[in-house]
Curated annotation (Swiss-Prot):
Transmembrane annotation, as ranges: none
Keyword annotations from UniProtKB, A to Z: Cytoplasm, Glycosyltransferase, Purine salvage, Transferase
Primary role: Catalyzes a salvage reaction resulting in the formation of IMP that is energically less costly than de novo synthesis.
Predominant localisation class: cytoplasm
Subunit-level organization: Homodimer.
Any single GO CC term annotated in Swiss-Prot or TrEMBL for this entry: cytoplasm
Official protein name in the record: Hypoxanthine/guanine phosphoribosyltransferase
GO molecular function per UniProt: guanine phosphoribosyltransferase activity; hypoxanthine phosphoribosyltransferase activity
Reaction equations catalysed: IMP + diphosphate = hypoxanthine + 5-phospho-alpha-D-ribose 1-diphosphate; GMP + diphosphate = guanine + 5-phospho-alpha-D-ribose 1-diphosphate
SUPFAM superfamilies in UniProt: PRTase-like (SSF53271)
Matches recorded under NCBIfam families: HPT_Archaea, PRK02304.1-4
Amino acid sequence: MKRLLENSLETCPIVKRGPYHYFIHPISDGVPLVEPELLRDVSTRVIKMIDTNVDKIVTAEAMGIPIVTAVSIATDIPYVIMRKREYLLEGEVPVHQETGYSKGELYLNGINKGDKVVILDDVISTGGTLVAIIRALKRAGADIKDVVCIIDRGQGKNIVEKETGYKVKTLVKIEVVDGKVKILE
């Protein structure tokens, strides 16, 4: 039996920008509408696959925020958001991020040496964001216990493991074929 996430992916709209086909989905884009049932399905599944004996959950701005909030509320684990804006706080860790479609800076605050963390994000495609997050957390002295992305599209999991040594857990693997999302696993 397919779950809510998989069903919603198979029916989501696809838009083409240049050579790239983007799937538009509530988990990855916050549009057209984020239904509480979908967020509950995703967060419940994430909680079952992560080490909950951690100090903090880390995500990148912006679409990891709804997911990390739901997981945080359900587990009582606080979370940290890697922001796209510099705050100039003591201990802030800047990191350059490059994906297949953008590049820029992320800034990590609120992580102390020895913090046990789970990384949680919405989509992995090129792996660029996760590689940047992992490097920033290692520079800050964090102990990374799990790395999780909801949707796997592309070769990002392999790239992250090759460049960082961390395996990325995902809920669903997809590809866009003939203008539709196809569930691979």
